[in-house]
Amino acid sequence: MTIPTYSTLHIEYDQGVATVSINNPPVNVLDVALMSDIRAFLTQVRDDPQTRVIVFQSADPEFFIAHVDMTLIDEPNAFDQFAKDLPNGLNPFQALGEMIQAQPQVTIVKLEGLARGGGAEFVAAVDMAFAAIGRAGLAQCEALMGIIPGGGGTQYLSQRMTWGRALEVILGAELIDALLAERYGWVNRALPANELDAFVHRIATNIAALPEGVTAAAKKVISPADLSEGFLREHKAWAGLFARPAAEKLIRGGLQAGAQTKVGEQDLEQLLRDLSAS
């Protein structure tokens, strides 16, 4: 199979496993370029029988996918180019998660750094996720921007963890470390950082080596529930909050205070809380 060139992704194939390294500096925000590349790659390999497992990782050890590009506040129609391909009722961010879930290959995230907002939703959408103890962190910090998760997070989290824990994650808006993420069900396992690569390589290659049809059968019978009504509720609530002046003020203030920079993203939750308190 010919491997296209992507501006934000580097792809390597080995033993039926496609390893996708995300590289969208400075902090891997989920912007139009990154979403375009991920969608194009998933479409490219969807019907490729030689690709049996997809492992997503980051070229930056500090950040997996920081979150959705906050400059969306200035370009609210930036993602409209994806509208023609969207299933009824889904926004582009929800549609990306559903595209991942519908992928015939097993999808795995190897999480070494931070994933917030849309990045954390990406982690919740894949089939499996494994996180490095002491390095990985997850957060749905949207509440600190005056909104709620709008890319499927409310629905995926309520499947992966209890109702109360999902509310805690969304409304508490705190950075969750790898061990607590494992306990809550956000990731499959938390592993020592020096063991993560070998473990993910082993499980990915073992799955890729299974007899033909086994993976497809397992994914079919262990399929997630129909979340279409939940997505509609989520989008309506998210869009309503996003349009309010309070959200615009917090998002713009966050950008001015250093969000989407390496320094500002280290403790984004506190940066946003300080804005709310001012």
Where are these regions (language model features)?
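Catalytic-core regions built around general acid/base machinery
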Residues: 41-44, 92-104
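Crotonase-fold acyl-CoA enzyme core
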Residues: 98-212
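Conserved CoA-thioester-binding segment of acyl-CoA-metabolizing enzymes
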Residues: 1-57
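C-terminal alpha-helix plus adjacent terminal tail
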Residues: 1-14, 61, 173, 177-178, ...
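Acidic-histidine catalytic/liganding microenvironments
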Residues: 48, 103-104, 244
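Charged catalytic carboxylate motif
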Residues: 33-37, 92, 99, 199, ...
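Hydrophobic/aromatic residues within transmembrane alpha-helices
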Residues: 20, 56, 69, 122-124, ...
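Glycine- (often His-adjacent) and acidic-residue-rich active-site loop
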Residues: 58-95, 115, 146
